[in-house]
Amino acid sequence: MSIGIVGRKAGMTRVFTEDGASVPVTVIEASPNRVTQVRTPERDGYSGVQVTAGSRRPNRVSKPMAGHFAAAGVDAGRGVWEFRVSDGQAIELEAGKELTVETFEAGQVVDITGTSKGKGFAGTVKRHNFRTQDATHGNSLAHRAPGSIGQNQTPGRVFKGKKMAGQMGNKRSTVKNLEVVRVDAERHLLLVRGSVPGAVGSDVIVRPARNQRKKGDS
């Protein structure tokens, strides 16, 4: 039963297939997630499961959260996350139960959510891949300027969504349809083909793929 799991990005490496091909993989360290609460349609209006992962010193846990963890009978974690589940899956879960990497298997396709690396305030060339203007031929100040951002008196404004300079990165991002290459249950590791959002050590959420791409689709 694959619901999802919260882990930490440990870095990237590569593994070799039986025929010697090199496959780049991201290593996700996912210690057992502890169920802290089960959402039910009768009480909450939907079915879901709330989990915590990792650990946190008692003096760093607020009293409300300490009581929440104590009521579930689990050790305090570094945060809480929630997964939507079907009514049937919710029945099989209860507070205190653990979710491990063994809920996934090699060859399975997953979606991974994380917070992308923050790049600070970036211009349009770096942020949106705009082409630069001429280096010479009368251009002396606008080499990396975006150019026109609108029209004239009509409409007399800049349209929403216009690609301009601004904060780059540090946003919640999801990469879809990544293949699980290997599951190491002994060391609580998931090896996923390709790269995932975020810096090394950041939290990532691994879920079964919602819209799995079939072979041959472009």
Swiss-Prot record:
GO terms for biological process: translation. It comes from the Bacteria. It comes from Alkalilimnicola ehrlichii (strain ATCC BAA-1101 / DSM 17681 / MLHE-1). Belongs to the universal ribosomal protein uL3 family. One of the primary rRNA binding proteins, it binds directly near the 3'-end of the 23S rRNA, where it nucleates assembly of the 50S subunit. Methylated by PrmB. PROSITE patterns: RIBOSOMAL_L3. This is Large ribosomal subunit protein uL3. Part of the 50S ribosomal subunit. Forms a cluster with proteins L14 and L19. Pfam families: Ribosomal_L3. The keyword Ribosomal protein applies.
